[in-house]
């Protein structure tokens, strides 16, 4: 099985090197800055055991496609993918990429939510912030929270996120929240995402807009850029499967309005391709970005 996996990696790397530049009119730019959410390859490196077995081949294949940075998605008790922060950073840099950010989450307990005392959860965050600083992260992003029952609970979470953001800022990192589609539901008449943006400090909390989930939630990324300019420091560029293949996400409009959004960088996530097909999905997505004239070399 591992031999087959290696052969697939080699084949995809060969396609990456030649596939997008087969004609003389190709506008491929090999040095565009684009990061990848490693959750895309979760079936290959998504836990400590898989990471230990496959990370060298997978990370090299991703780097060979033109990806320049990574966002992690496996943190537990001071370790990233089962290795120390320093080891993880070295693994990424060994293939020529850099560590950008990480998805981690610590939900409030019912007692904390009721009392507004976050002491226990903030101790967890202090350890996580120290680990992510050691890994060279620029950002930490909370990837999920459930829809709360009341606005009071949602306000408590906003205060919690402000405090996490304050601690990240003190450590020299940014803190953000990543949306899915459920944040467009209403809580006591208020759209959850709008309420969160309005009740978090822009100096402490940015929003990592996942453009696919915004569209899936029947909203417009560009309308949100215009409504809350500067709040979307990092974007998740995602589609139903490979980037640019579904036709449902207007990536040209999104990138053409990146300055209004406040976008400093973007991260590609291919969530709909599983197992070894994730590698091919990442290649197709990288080629789409490299050949799209509306995507600048850097932001």
Give the location of each predicted region.
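Short acidic/polar active-site loop segments enriched in Thr and Asp
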Residues: 68, 98, 138-139, 233, ...
């Amino acid at each position: 099985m591992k031999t087959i996996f290696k052969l697939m990696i080699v084949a995809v790397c060969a396609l990456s090197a030649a596939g997008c530049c087969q004609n003389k009119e190709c506008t491929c730019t090999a040095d565009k800055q684009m990061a990848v959410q490693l959750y895309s390859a979760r079936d290959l490196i998504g836990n400590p055991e898989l990471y230990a077995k496959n990370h060298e081949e997978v990370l090299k294949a991703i780097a060979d496609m033109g990806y320049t940075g990574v966002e992690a998605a496996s943190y537990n008790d001071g370790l990233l993918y089962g290795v120390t922060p320093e080891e993880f950073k070295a693994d990424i840099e060994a293939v020529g990429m850099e560590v950008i950010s990480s998805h981690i989450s610590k939900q409030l307990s019912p007692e904390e939510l009721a009392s507004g005392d976050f002491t226990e959860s903030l101790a967890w965050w202090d350890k996580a912030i120290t680990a992510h600083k050691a890994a060279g992260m620029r950002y930490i992003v909370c990837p999920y929270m459930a829809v709360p029952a009341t606005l009071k609970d949602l306000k408590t979470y906003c205060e919690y996120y402000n405090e996490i953001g304050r601690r990240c800022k003190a450590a020299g990192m940014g803190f953000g929240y990543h949306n899915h589609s459920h944040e467009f539901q209403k809580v006591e008449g208020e759209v959850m995402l709008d309420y969160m943006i309005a009740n978090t400090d822009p100096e402490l909390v940015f929003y990592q807009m996942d453009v696919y989930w915004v569209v899936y939630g029947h909203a417009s990324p560009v309308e949100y850029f215009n409504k809350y300019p500067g709040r979307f420091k990092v974007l998740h560029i995602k589609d139903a499967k490979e980037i640019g293949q579904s036709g449902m996400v207007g990536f040209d409009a999104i990138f053409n309005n990146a300055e209004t959004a406040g976008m400093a960088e973007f991260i590609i996530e291919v969530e709909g391709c599983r197992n070894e097909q994730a590698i091919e999905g990442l290649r197709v997505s990288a080629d789409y970005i490299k050949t799209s004239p509306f995507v600048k070399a850097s932001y």
